[in-house]
Each structure stands twice: as C-alpha cells, then as structure tokens.
C-alpha cells in the first residue's frame, strides 16, 4: 500500500545518500 511505497522511497533515498558519502 501507500506506506510500503513511502518506505521504499525512503530506503532508496537513504541508500543513495550512503553511497554518495562512501564514494
């Protein structure tokens, strides 16, 4: 549902943020 979509978007953003820091 909507909550799952929000969690997926948040996880994607967090992963991208961490990847940006590490690289």
Swiss-Prot record:
Function: Has no antimicrobial activity.
One of the GO biological process terms: defense response
Species for this entry: Ranoidea dahlii (Dahl's aquatic frog)
Location in or out of the cell: Secreted
Keywords associated with the record: Amphibian defense peptide, Secreted
Domain of life, per lineage: Eukaryota
Signal peptide segment: none
Protein name: Dahlein-4.3
Tissue spec: Expressed by the skin dorsal glands.
GO cellular component, one term: extracellular region
């Amino acid at each position: 549902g909507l909550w799952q979509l929000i969690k997926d978007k948040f996880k994607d953003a967090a992963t991208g943020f961490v990847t940006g820091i590490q690289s």
